[in-house]
């Protein structure tokens, strides 16, 4: 999509919505009211997803690991999982408190049904999921990627078994249309027992080093079993290697038999060396799948180190992956020999005779690094490598002073913070074992300091001076331009950077979430770096901390008091003295604690608006509570899980996606209904919601209507359960397109039946 068209669509989208919203506010028609409420619901659901993944979960992660010192494995299955499920739990509480318990129960049933059918069904459409023994984490070759993913069969059986137990417990308790106090206690205790068991049986790597080491070990096994040689090698040439013959034809010696200098670069005429040029380009083309595979493995390692348990992917990581989606396609573009027709070289990259001028690359292959790329095919190279490593720095810097020509090296560019280093690409002229061992070391050292998927990719790709130099859009869609520092304005990056290319759905998501992201960026304090903490507070962070009492009060009570101004003044004075005495100490603790409180308040406010809007629809349009919970409420709360899990599957991090589909229902239903029911029954002093107050507290109960829509969805969940327990084993223990079609068809049929029953009021 061209830049003017992007700007035109963006401006038209926002201007038209502003006009329609203004018209809806000034008119009283049902259509305008429906449109206005629809916009409010969409933005509130977007707010729930963004604030949960980008604000609440990171703050909970920091608090659990840095303040309470809880391990990632425990926090991932408890605090972080609860934080991720907080929108659903809050929705259930607000619905029960508003007297529309059927809306809450319908949303929970609909959410479970949506995850088990639509989400898993679409996951099976993206890739065939095979349940095999001891295949919990797998790495994939270019040929098989996006086609077959493996998941440990024992983990699948465990997930289905726990889900079955949850289904029996919840179905038994809710079948009579009453939720007793003692049933709520049993639900919460059941969830706690299941969480403890899952924590003890958790087998996936939680540390970045563990994840990357496992990826490398599996890759080594695949290479050894299939006798695959790493194709990502070049035969680099130098001027000292070029010898003349009587015929005037020059020949080239391999890099491993010569000395190297990258201080100067000269041009080679590819027409004079057609066989060598063709061989070099052929080697590069063969190396493209290997480099893509390395990047995907590093992204999977990043995700496994940052997402533990049932946690959604952040909006920023989703946007970064969408921008680099070309990395996950099997179609690999290849290079051809340069010619006048292909325009592979620009005029600036040609010498006086029109031959390609290959220039050195800065900030990547330094003189000392060339020793790492010497071929170890003979003893001379090994001795040279040992001698070079032991030589002083100044000796080998002086040693390389002769002009050098590197046929397929990278054009020179200015040093910048966004320069992408080739050091993260598999080494060019080494054997498989050396490549993999060094790759593991370098990958662990570099990835530990990375803040985002964009950093992972940027540190794994070649960076070129111009977009039309040799490899433009061959490896990825990574932009060569600098990005804005504010993640909230990623839409601006897409509008101004032509090299970025995302799909229509992703573009629409940017348009919808950008206003919400900007509001959250300005309201909730955050740290840009995930690795460097206790940095000096910025002006924006100081303002956010000072204004936090006022924002919290407005989100919770909507009542303004002058005492809030005094409290903000006190906070400003304390921050001033803190800056004078201990400027950086406890900064991260303060930021993440305030961010956690503000995130909770934002969630509560957004859920309240959603419940009020849906309750208004129930009264105006005469729609049952259950059908709204099964459809609108479910779709709004589950769209984040759908996008996140599909993205996990596309990358190959299957264990998080499967765990979220089977673990989230356990969390939403058992803990959500149980905990919310306990809180409602203990807090209802008037008896408007809770019945049976004359008897023992254990017999206090909340009544709700079990209508035909709820029964219909329950039957759909049972059929989905039969698909997972019967059809999948009969289908050779895999979820392919046949199973996916069955699941998606089941959801469509059940939803259509519910809508039919609602319309005809059977």
From Swiss-Prot:
The keyword Calcium does not apply. Disulfide bonds: none annotated. Keywords: Glycoprotein, Ion transport, Membrane, Signal, Transmembrane, Transmembrane helix, Transport. GO terms for biological process: calcineurin-mediated signaling; intracellular calcium ion homeostasis; monoatomic cation transport. Glycans are attached at residues 28, 148, 280, 329, 645. GO terms for molecular function: monoatomic cation transmembrane transporter activity. Residues 52-102, 178, 523-554, 611-615, 672-709, 760-762 are cytoplasmic. It holds the Pfam family Na_Ca_ex. GO terms for cellular component: endoplasmic reticulum; fungal-type vacuole membrane; Golgi apparatus; membrane. It is found in: Membrane. The chain crosses the membrane at residues 31-51, 103-123, 157-177, 179-199, 502-522, 555-575, 590-610, 616-636, 651-671, 710-730, 739-759. InterPro entries: CaCA_antiporter, NaCa_Exmemb, NCX_ion-bd_dom_sf. It is a multi-pass membrane protein. It comes from the Eukaryota. Residues 27-30, 124-156, 200-501, 576-589, 637-650, 731-738 are extracellular. Residues 1-26 form the signal peptide. The keyword Transport applies. Belongs to the Ca(2+):cation antiporter (CaCA) (TC 2.A.19) family. Putative cation exchanger. This is Putative cation exchanger YDL206W. It comes from Saccharomyces cerevisiae (strain ATCC 204508 / S288c) (Baker's yeast).
